[in-house]
Amino acid sequence: MASRPKRRAVSRVPPALGDEEEEDEVEEQDEDDSDEEEDEEDEVVNEEVNIEFEAYSISDNDYDGIKKLLQQLFLKAPVNTAELTNLLIQQNHIGSVIKQTDVSEDSDDEVDEDEIFGFISLLNLTERKGTPCAEQIKELILRLCEKNCEKSMVEQLDRLFNDTARPVGFLLSERFINVPPQIALPMHQQLQKELAEAHRANKPCGKCYFYLLISKTFVEAGKSNSKKKRSNQKKDELMFANAEEEFFYEKAILKFNYSVQEESDTCLGGRWSFDDVPMKPLRTVMLIPGDKMSEIMEKLKEHLSV
């Protein structure tokens, strides 16, 4: 049996505490005796499970988990997620996966030590020019940009994709929705250290002049209709599945949204509502200058430090 991958220098992060428990107690006081059984069932459903997460280097055992998270990002888009997953595993000098912290043998919990709850990595699209999945990603972004943006933005993005002197890195940071955003800070910090080391050692994925990011976002249903609106969505209208990606959005020199309403058929990408307001699932594409990453890291540190 293969040994478990080495731990990354990332802090353990407990899940964020919910505020549902207090609300449930108030509701129970107002319920009739006939509803007690239903309340008990709700209490079980809302029970908080305290799980700690830890980061590990990416290994072959993480293939299924990474591919699943990539499929949630791309949905039905024509991108070979199997090939992309293999590339991320091959270049495991960068990137990390989030797993549950080791559980003692006498624990009653059934834990799959290979189950991943999220990952972070980067694919240098410029270095990988000609690789099928890298070309598919660029073609997808350009096609969606053409559909949702003005011609000038499409031309700008096309020039950047073809500028071999200024590499574009595709930043991937995906996790399940129950993983707290606080884990994003050490994960991104570690990735930046690994990218800097790769650059010094002349390894793949080294220096990136731009970072491309596709973020899972939501907007109130009925908004984001016109082409101009989709390419210039107001930040306060967008809700980010990964809360920290709002800081990347603020520094992006190019950004646009596209709807995935027709492609979404899962819990993480399907029908959403906040305060009884129906939400429309989107993907938000951003291009961030590499020299803005230190400012973004400071923002993450300010808002996500545990």
Swiss-Prot record:
Residues 1-10 have a biased composition (Basic residues). Residues 51-159 are annotated as: Interaction with BRCA2. GO terms for cellular component: centriole; centrosome; cytoplasm; mitotic spindle pole; nucleus. Residues 1-45 are annotated as: Disordered. It comes from the Eukaryota. InterPro entries: BCP1_family (IPR025602). It is found in: Nucleus; Cytoplasm, Cytoskeleton, Microtubule organizing center, Centrosome, Centriole; Cytoplasm, Cytoskeleton, Spindle pole. It holds the Pfam family BCCIP. One of its GO terms (biological process) is mitotic spindle assembly. The keyword Cell membrane does not apply. Residues 18-45 have a biased composition (Acidic residues). Residues 153-251 are annotated as: Interaction with CDKN1A. Belongs to the BCP1 family. Interacts with BRCA2, CDKN1A and MTDH/LYRIC. Interacts with DCTN1/p150-glued and ACTR1A/ARP1. Interacts with alpha-, beta- and gamma-tubulins. Interacts with TENT5C; the interaction has no effect on TENT5C poly(A) polymerase function. During interphase, required for microtubule organizing and anchoring activities. During mitosis, required for the organization and stabilization of the spindle pole. May promote cell cycle arrest by enhancing the inhibition of CDK2 activity by CDKN1A. May be required for repair of DNA damage by homologous recombination in conjunction with BRCA2. May not be involved in non-homologous end joining (NHEJ). This is BRCA2 and CDKN1A-interacting protein. The gene is BCCIP.
